[in-house]
Design a protein with these regions (language model features):
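Alpha-helical recognition segments enriched in aromatics with Gly/Pro capping
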Residues: 1-34, 49, 99, 120-329
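Short, polar/flexible loop-turn hinges at active-site or ligand-entry regions and domain interfaces
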Residues: 82-88, 109, 300-304
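Short, glycine/charge-rich beta-strand/loop segments that flank catalytic centers
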Residues: 68-72, 93-97, 107-122, 139-149
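Surface-exposed helix-capping loop/turn segments at secondary-structure junctions
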Residues: 58-61, 103-110, 135, 220, ...
Length: 441
């Protein structure tokens, strides 16, 4: 059975044909560790964990590289605001990130390089870009000269002029052209810095991923992934500098991007002030519920995060756990069941198959296949006792939201809208919150 993926480089769904079937290479942009990850950050973690599983189900060797950006302007700013050292900040956030990955039941990537461990590779790439005529030095900075790369904008499917007009590009007197991006820049006092031919400084963000992917996957590899917000400028710049430094016709063959998570149809982002940190869910709910919620929509479609979604996923897993038995031996998941995942990671289609398998298993037919199919995408990974503990002890709604609902219910009762009051009471009960009325209040 063939794997099909939507390739944003061609804007087509294509059959996945690896460069070398004996060793599949996939690079995914990981976290910039300036703050604990939020639910929006969780989506690529889970989406590409699923793709990793799919690739391993078909190919004997898959190398999955997910980097950690531990040198960046955001990290410097965050450490200054918190009045802690950069190393203490990055170590703390990396630890939290790994705990979040475990909570979401994600496999570890094959490699997880940190940017600060690969500065020499970055310097060598800059030297190669200068030698090839694509980079220039200016006032201790080194820039990539975008207009010299004729395919710039291919991933975004836009002309250079359109990209410049529609984005916030750093303005600097050091640049030859507005669109040029930094490969190396000098560091201020008390900022991270490394010796280089251009003086003490640090690499540009885009360069970091190009250097690390080259080290672990070579000049050309199969899949590059990340969030849709990385298409421009990050991934566009990666392609430009990698192809020009490596003298290659391609960088990555397939470019896969997941859409945003929204709240009230607005992108979830730190800049929006509407984030929900993953760690805040750890003691309230099973990571399986979050994982199922993240898989409930196709990765290319926006996913609106709300209490109803979480409640539905909780109820689904409650139902599935009724027939779960950890003693049952696993079996191979059939091609028919796996087919939606092979068709561009169609997780809603796969979940639909799980519901059908459950209905059969609930009647005593194919329980082994149902449980194995759930485990394939990282579900039913806790025993019944632990699941029951979560269900019994943990509310699925924040205290702030509980108080809001109680106020709404009190208003409904005051207006003698008892139907609405009962609906809110039942909704809270489904989320693990029991309301008892005493003395008519």
């Amino acid at each position: 059975m063939d794997i099909f993926l939507t390739n944003n480089l061609t804007n087509k769904k294509e059959k996945f044909i690896p460069q070398n079937e004996g060793n599949i290479g996939m690079y995914v942009c990981g976290p910039t560790v300036y703050d604990d990850p939020h639910i929006g950050n969780a989506r690529p973690i889970v989406v590409f964990d699923i793709l990793f599983k799919i690739l391993k189900s078909k190919f004997s060797s898959v190398t999955y590289v997910r980097n950690i950006t531990d040198v960046d302007d955001k990290i410097i700013k965050s450490s200054q605001e918190r009045k802690i050292s950069i190393s203490n900040l990055t170590e703390s956030v990396i630890k939290s990130f790994h705990e979040d990955c475990n909570f979401l039941n994600c496999e570890s990537p094959s490699r997880e390089p940190k940017a600060t461990d690969h500065i020499s590779e970055m310097i060598n790439m800059i030297l190669k870009l200068k030698k090839n005529g694509y980079a220039y030095e200016s006032n201790k900075h080194v820039y990539f000269e975008v207009k010299k790369f004729k395919d710039y904008g291919q991933l975004s499917n836009k002309k250079l002029e359109e990209l410049i007009a529609g984005s916030r590009i750093e303005v600097s007197d050091n640049k030859k052209n507005t669109e040029d991006f930094v490969l190396w820049k000098p560091s201020n006092e008390n900022e991270p810095s490394w010796d280089s031919p251009w003086g003490k400084g640090r690499p540009g963000w885009h360069l970091e991923c190009s250097a690390m992917s080259k080290k672990f996957l070579g000049n050309e590899f199969d899949i590059h992934g990340g969030g849709i917000d990385l298409i421009f400028p990050h991934h566009e710049n990666e392609i430009a500098q990698s192809r020009c430094a490596n003298d290659s016709k391609i960088f990555a063959k397939y470019w896969i991007h997941n859409a945003f998570i929204t709240m009230s149809n607005e992108k979830m982002a730190k800049s929006q002030g509407n984030i929900l940190k993953i760690k805040d869910f750890r003691n309230k709910i099973s990571g399986q519920v979050i994982r199922l919620a993240l898989l409930s929509a196709h990765y290319k479609q926006p996913l609106d995060w709300n209490d109803k979604l979480i409640s539905e996923c909780q109820n689904t897993l409650n139902k599935w756990y009724r027939i779960y038995d950890k003693k049952i031996k696993s079996v191979d998941v059939t091609k028919e069941v796996l087919k939606p995942l092979y068709e561009d990671l169609n997780t809603p289609g796969y979940i639909s198959n799980l519901h059908q398998l459950f209905d059969k298993a609930n009647k005593g037919e194919g329980k082994e296949l149902f449980i194995s199919a759930c485990k394939f995408i990282g579900l039913l990974n806790e025993d019944n006792e632990k699941w029951e503990k979560y269900k019994k002890d943990k509310a699925l709604i924040s205290e702030v939201e509980i108080n809001k609902r109680i106020d709404l219910r009190n208003n409904a009762r005051a207006n003698k809208d008892y139907k609405e009051a009962d609906r809110i009471r039942d909704e809270l009960f489904d989320k693990g919150v029991l309301i008892e009325d005493k003395d008519g209040k």
